[in-house]
Each structure stands twice: as C-alpha cells, then as structure tokens.
C-alpha cells in the first residue's frame, strides 16, 4: 500500500463529503437487504426496534466504507471511477476517514446489541472486520479471487437482519446470503471488462488483469449458472411464493442470457461497440439483486405458498 498519510488535503470538507465517505450507494443495498431479511423473518419485530436495527446496520456498513476509503486512498487516486472520492481528492484526510470508520464501527455494534440482540451485533462486527481487513487489506491486492471471497461481506446484511429478528440463522437467510454471494463476481467482473485499464494501472489483480478478458467472460457465465438454483430455491422456502418465483425465473433467464452473450463476444467486437453488451449486463446486474429482494418483501405482504 502507498503512503496513506500522503492524502491529507485541506480542511475543506463539507457534510456531503463525510456522507460520501460512508459509500451511500453501496450502503443503500446493505440497508435494503438487511431490512428485508429482518422484516420477512418468522418472528415479528416492533417497528421502532426494526428501524433502530436497520439504522445501526447501515452505520456499520458506512463504517466499512470509511475504513475502505482510508486504506484504498492510494489506488482510488489513480482510478477514474474513484479519483473524486473524499480522501484521494483531498477533501477528507486519511486520519479523519480512519477515525470515522473506527468510531462508527464501535457505535453501530454496541447499539445493535442493545436494540436487537448480541448475536446480531457480533455478526455485524464480524462483517465489518471481514470487509475492512480480510477483503480491503488482504484479498483486494493479493488475488484475482478478491471479490469472490470478499463478496461475502456484502452478502451478510440480510443474515444480520434475520438474526435481529430471530437471534439465529435459518435456511432462508443462508439462501439470501448465497444469492448475493454468487451474484457479486459476475457483477464486478462485468465492470472489470470495460474498466480493465483502470484496475491494471492501480495494481489491483482483478481477473481481467491477471487472466485476461476471455477467461473472465467464461467465469461470468459460469457464475450465472451457479447463481440461478440458489435464487430459485429461495422461492420454495417459507419466505418464497409464486410471485417471488415468477420474478426470479424472469431475472435469472435474463441474467443467464446476458452471460451467454458476454461469453460469445470476441474482444474485437467489444472494443468496436465500446463494450455496449458488457455495460448493459452490468446495469442489469444492478437491478437483479434489488428486484429479488423487493419480490421477497412483496411476497411477504401478499402471503406465500
């Protein structure tokens, strides 16, 4: 890692910069999936307790984002997609990012334990550690499997939400985890297909950098095939139902078809049209998880099997 203390910019940060430090776009998916996991769990939760629990899970997700920005300031500075973030742009110092991350980590875990239960709080603490240390500090710069293993951090929130309600883990929460876990690699690899040069310049060993785009295309399609059974299986559990299953069938058919298109594309074709198919698949992947969890929520309201 480069010297993170080099990113010390002037004290010109506004409130929005500190919000950006928490990666609000990423946090929005964390909040939503955690809420769904909590709300569809078999044990009812007081709405105020549910609100507090989701709020503290969101703070934990924000803490992870701040710690990630603290450590990754050097590579963020050389990537077009991330150069404008608060730390590499100099609006927030690296010490401030670290302090915010540590403070929110402690606060979120403590308050979740008091609001819900200590099993869920411990799970949140593990998730923050996994994202900040296992993924950000260890995996991201050391292996092309970084987002495969590290993707677990983004898949834990619905399990944490479920644990807030039940105090434990169920097959339903494990399948929600699996849905996000196996969705993460094709989502990020699709991005890496048209952002390869950025990752290469930053020294991040994404699969496109270490093994090339052809191998990455094969992996994307393979993961769409692995993902589909877990997504569909969820439809036959206590939280599933015909509405969710119908949505999942359509989404997985589109996802597999998109993966097949990517697999069959040559690099010359992709470069000729500016990676149009790859960018379209990436946009589809953004809706894939959100619509699955929205379908679970609606299915819960209308009733399942």
Curated annotation (Swiss-Prot):
InterPro entries: Protohaem_IX_farnesylTrfase, UbiA_prenyltransferase, UbiA_prenylTrfase_CS, UbiA_sf. It is an enzyme of class 2 (transferase). Keywords: Cell inner membrane, Cell membrane, Heme biosynthesis, Membrane, Transferase, Transmembrane, Transmembrane helix. It holds the Pfam family UbiA. Interacts with CtaA. Converts heme B (protoheme IX) to heme O by substitution of the vinyl group on carbon 2 of heme B porphyrin ring with a hydroxyethyl farnesyl side group. This is Protoheme IX farnesyltransferase. It comes from Paracoccus denitrificans (strain Pd 1222). The gene is ctaB.
